[in-house]
């Protein structure tokens, strides 16, 4: 009932935090071993990587300020349910999940420039890929080709200076 009624309802209403929480609760009760194993791996990784992620973000923050962008940067760790679903759907191991950590760059479009909102996404992409190596097969362009649900963003996966893959999602506040 939760999986087929309440989770889709929360998603449709835009209650993404509640949706994620219900998915994790569902996983904890339906697949307790998988839930505990994934949660333990997340906890080990997050404690070790939090400083590295902040160190990854700092130069991006500075470069975007220097380029004149108005923005905020948020970070997130993928939820246990999302990890479990990806592992099962793609038949991959935990270590093959490249978007365990994600950084969202949400910018305010500059109306005083000739660059369109889309161009500004690519400008940010150009700045950050000039700083970090990116995984070319992990670039997702949902700015030029929005998802069926209307989602727009530019995703790429970058290698930090310490060797961890971090997904970066670039979008305007409107997107």
Please give the residue ranges for each predicted region.
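Nucleic-acid processing machinery
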Residues: 1-175
């Amino acid at each position: 009932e939760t999986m087929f009624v309440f989770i889709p309802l929360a998603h449709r209403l835009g209650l993404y935090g509640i949706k994620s929480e219900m998915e994790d609760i569902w996983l904890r009760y339906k697949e307790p071993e998988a839930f505990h194993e994934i949660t333990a791996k997340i906890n080990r990784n997050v404690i070790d990587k939090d400083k590295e992620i902040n160190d990854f973000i700092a130069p991006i923050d500075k470069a975007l300020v220097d380029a004149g962008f108005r923005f905020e940067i948020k970070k997130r760790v993928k939820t246990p349910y999302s990890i479990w679903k990806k592992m099962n759907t793609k038949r991959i191991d935990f270590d093959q999940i490249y978007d365990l950590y994600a950084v969202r760059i949400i910018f305010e479009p500059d109306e005083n420039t000739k660059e369109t909102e889309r161009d500004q996404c690519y400008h940010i992409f150009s700045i950050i890929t000039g700083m970090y190596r990116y995984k070319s097969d992990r670039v997702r362009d949902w700015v030029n080709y929005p998802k069926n649900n209307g989602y727009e963003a530019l995703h790429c996966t970058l290698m930090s200076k310490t060797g961890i893959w971090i997904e970066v999602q670039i979008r305007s506040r409107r997107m």
